[in-house]
């Protein structure tokens, strides 16, 4: 996207601006004192398209009958100029004009929907601050299906029965995770199912995006439905300051899968943890979970070892685990955290602080796989 014009409010005039290497550099007509607050208005244009990254092409993508946005971790600049770091949360107004009969689904509340000729203008507004990578726009020929008092699905009409079957327990999931983690942190929860298959589902703030391959009707992907929902607490409401700490998001999301399976009577969280521990034991032990590096940040070992870290802490704290976790999620709702903030809270609640420190260090900072937590 190309910046066309930049103006400032409550600041000297923007004398010159230059855009290169993903940065917009401004020169003001006069010096601005440190600490001065001001507003920038950036007018920009171009054709949204995916960005090539270490992890493949991400960002704005065309689908068979519309478009979608999946920006994690750095695809947001594919459709708007931004400080694309997870710590840069802001309030958003997202306004999209689409040809009829296309439906636009985005983050926050639908403020207005205005028809004009053969197009419709959709205006969404977030109530809570949001990280750039969580901003999304889904465009397609969708129908909407209620899944519960605070949950809704958007999908092509032809997929209705499969969607209602696959997401039949979505509201129960919201209620279950709310009992563990505290009230759901946004006004509602929506899922969008595209006609395209999509390799993996993705979370955005207040909604998640699934492909048609994820709704076979046999509940084979139920764990992923639980995983994406849990990100509304871990990652979306309480966000990361740096991507190196991604285990905090993904570890709790994977652990939530195990807790849901236990809730449904399919297995226990401990049995699920043991199963994944055994798989990890057959893989290379050559990454550090607390800082895996860009190439390995989405490695499944980071996800599962992060979840096993959470399981180990749960075993150490017992009943104090969820009490401490709920307090942390409430205190830091809609803000940005570092892992030490939660780990310090857990340490204070642990019966043996020295054992807690040793356990966390072994799981997060050492490459060798520690013994299974008993």
Language-model features: where?
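Glycine/proline-rich low-complexity spacer/linker segments in large multi-domain proteins
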Residues: 34, 39-93, 140, 144-148
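Amphipathic alpha-helical substructures
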Residues: 299-374
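Hydrophobic helix-coil surface modules that form long, contiguous segments used
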Residues: 82-226, 255
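Short helix/loop segments within enzyme catalytic domains
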Residues: 260-281, 320-329
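An active-site-proximal "capping" alpha-helix that borders the catalytic cofactor pocket
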Residues: 94, 177, 249-261, 342-346
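A surface-exposed beta-strand-loop module
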Residues: 1-61
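Beta-strand-rich interaction surfaces with strong enrichment in secreted/lumenal proteins
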Residues: 13-15, 27-32, 79-84, 109-113
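Zinc-dependent metallopeptidase catalytic helix centered on the HExxH motif
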Residues: 87, 207-272
């Amino acid at each position: 996207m190309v910046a066309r014009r930049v103006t400032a409010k409550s600041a000297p005039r923007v004398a010159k601006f230059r855009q290169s290497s993903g940065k917009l550099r401004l020169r003001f007509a006069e010096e601005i004192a440190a600490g001065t607050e001001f507003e920038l208005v950036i007018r920009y244009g171009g054709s949204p398209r995916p960005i090539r990254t270490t992890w493949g092409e991400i960002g704005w993508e065309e689908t068979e009958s519309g478009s979608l946005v999946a920006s994690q971790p750095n695809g947001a600049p594919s459709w708007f100029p931004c400080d694309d770091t997870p710590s840069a949360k802001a309030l958003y107004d997202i306004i999209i004009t689409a040809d009829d009969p296309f439906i636009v689904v985005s983050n926050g509340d639908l403020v207005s929907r205005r028809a004009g000729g053969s197009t419709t203008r959709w205006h969404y507004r977030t109530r809570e601050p949001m990280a750039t990578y969580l901003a999304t726009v889904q465009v397609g020929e969708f129908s909407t299906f209620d899944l519960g008092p605070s949950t809704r699905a958007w999908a092509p009409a032809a997929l209705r029965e499969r969607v209602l079957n696959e997401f039949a327990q979505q509201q129960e999931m919201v209620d279950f995770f709310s009992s563990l983690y505290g009230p759901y942190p946004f006004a509602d929860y929506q899922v969008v199912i595209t006609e395209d298959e999509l390799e993996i589902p993705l979370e955005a703030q207040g909604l998640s995006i699934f492909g048609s391959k994820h709704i076979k009707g046999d509940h084979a992907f139920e764990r992923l439905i639980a995983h994406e929902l849990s990100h509304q607490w871990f990652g979306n409401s309480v966000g990361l300051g740096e991507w190196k700490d991604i285990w905090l998001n993904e570890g709790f999301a994977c652990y939530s899968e195990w807790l849901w399976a236990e809730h449904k009577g399919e297995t226990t969280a401990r049995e699920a943890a043991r199963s994944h521990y055994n798989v990890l034991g057959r893989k290379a032990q050559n990454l550090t979970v607390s800082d895996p590096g860009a190439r390995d940040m989405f490695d499944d070992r980071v996800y599962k070892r992060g979840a096993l870290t959470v399981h180990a802490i749960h075993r150490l704290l017992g009943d104090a685990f969820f009490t401490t976790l709920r307090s942390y999620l409430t205190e830091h709702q809609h803000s940005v955290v570092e892992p030490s903030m939660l780990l310090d809270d857990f340490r204070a609640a642990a019966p043996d602080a020295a054992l807690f420190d040793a356990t966390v260090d072994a799981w997060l900072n050492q490459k060798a796989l520690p013994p299974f937590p008993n």
